[in-house]
Every structure is written in C-alpha cells, then in structure tokens.
C-alpha cells in the first residue's frame, strides 16, 4: 500500500513512462523509406539487440551481463520523443537525443539507467558500449538478410555499405566473426534443419 504522497507521485510518473515506451511499437524505423514495408519495429529491433549484445559479450569474455542487458534495453528509448533518423536524414536533421532520453527517464524509478547506462553507451568509450553498438549494427545485417530472403532487391544493393560497416564500424572481433558467418547463413535453416536437433517422428503424419 502506498502511504506517502512522494511515492504515489513517483508511481504515477512511472506509469506515464510505461505508456510512453509502449508507443515505440508505433514508431517507424526510418529506413522503411528505403526498404518499404515489413521493417521491424523499434521494440522488435531492441529485443534481438539484447540477445546479440549478450552473444558478443560472452564471445569477448565480458562478465557484466547485467550492464549489457540494461544498455541494450534502453539504447533507443529517446526515439519515443525524437523518432528515428536514417543515415541520409541524419546528415540534415539534428536530434537532441541526450535531452530526450534524460527527460524520458526524469522522475522515474529508472533515472539511473540514463545516468549510469545510456550516457555511457552514447559516449562509446567502454567495452560495454562498443559491444552494444556492435549488436545494434549487426541486427541491421540480420534484418537485411531476412528481407533478401523475402525477395527484397534493395536489401542486396545495401551490401557494399554493410561491408564498409563491417570494416570501419564494428569494434569487437566477435561481432566481425558473426558478421562473416551471417553472409553464409540461411535465415530459414533454424526450422528447415530442425530434425538435426529435435526429434519429430510424427512430422507430416
């Protein structure tokens, strides 16, 4: 039971925050301008980034997995207020993501995530921040492969720019190894080859 006004007020602010981050499912990724429909939403992108970041962290023997998960979870939170900006729009549009993120977390139970985690990510100086940024980039490559599997021609045309990302932007050796394997991987093999891992004697009967 809530007894004091300060705590009750804070809970109201936390609920506002929960509604705000819920709107990310309605926030379009701006590269949809180039790729057409079918792009992952911000929360869908964030979900896989968390697993990618954990995968890279384990490959790099980085032990603070709690920080990795928190950082991946909040890395795009500012987009509730700024929206997304693709690589071309970013040349012309200035977004105050730092202020947007600070204001989003202001007065909530999660204010420490901005102060202790998100600022670190944006500065890109620590191992954790580099791991999460690598995950952010790799999710784009995975999604492009999924789009290509569905017949997207523009996804194939993005290959030269993604090779440049691999050469110039990926920080960790683990991320580079994952990128290299992605070029050979079949997005459908997880279910097409399921019998290799799972006994399904009654399949097709």
How would you describe each model-predicted region?
Residues 1-205:
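Alpha-helical, largely C-terminal catalytic domains
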């Amino acid at each position: 039971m809530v007894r004091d006004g300060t705590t009750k007020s804070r809970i109201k602010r936390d609920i506002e925050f929960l509604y705000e981050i819920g709107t990310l499912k309605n926030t379009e990724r701006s590269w949809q301008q180039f790729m057409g429909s079918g792009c992952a939403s911000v929360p869908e992108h964030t979900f896989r980034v968390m697993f990618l970041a954990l995968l890279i962290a384990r490959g790099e023997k980085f032990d603070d997995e709690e920080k990795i998960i928190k950082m991946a979870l909040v890395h795009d939170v500012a987009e509730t207020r700024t929206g997304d900006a693709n690589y071309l729009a970013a040349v012309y549009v200035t977004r105050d993501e730092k202020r947007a993120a600070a204001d989003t977390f202001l007065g909530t139970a999660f204010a420490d995530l901005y102060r202790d985690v998100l600022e670190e990510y944006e500065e890109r100086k620590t191992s954790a921040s580099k791991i999460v940024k690598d995950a952010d980039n790799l999710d784009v490559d995975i999604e492009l492969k999924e789009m290509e599997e569905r017949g997207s021609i523009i996804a194939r045309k993005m290959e030269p720019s993604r090779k440049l990302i691999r050469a110039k932007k990926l920080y960790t050796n683990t991320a580079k190894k994952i990128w290299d394997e992605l070029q050979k991987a079949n997005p459908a093999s997880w279910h097409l080859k399921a019998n290799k891992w799972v006994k399904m004697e009654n399949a097709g009967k």
